[in-house]
């Protein structure tokens, strides 16, 4: 699966790392401590240094992306899977990376974001997409 989808792997990996590029460009404007985690109530409850926030979170997501791709490609039953479902494996983490890092940078620049309102809706949309492509 990975050999015939090399371009997808490269493009999805670049998309996951795009927030790090934004962080490098905006490095001097970012505060030294950045909110990287919010509780279920939408309040910030986790802070990280600028280096981890800019580089660590995209790298962790990239590693997780590679692990998901590896396990999916090693699955003997993946040939029987719907190709759209397999394609979702390539694009879930890039979308999550852009969204979560976008929220993180938005908070770093002092912009409000009502996470408690949007997260249930976004999780619902994600489950709808996943539910439509899982085998029955």
Q: Where on the chain are the PLM-derived regions?
A:
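Feature 926 captures the class I aminoacyl-tRNA synthetase adenylation module centered on the KMSKS loop
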Residues: 2-34, 39-136
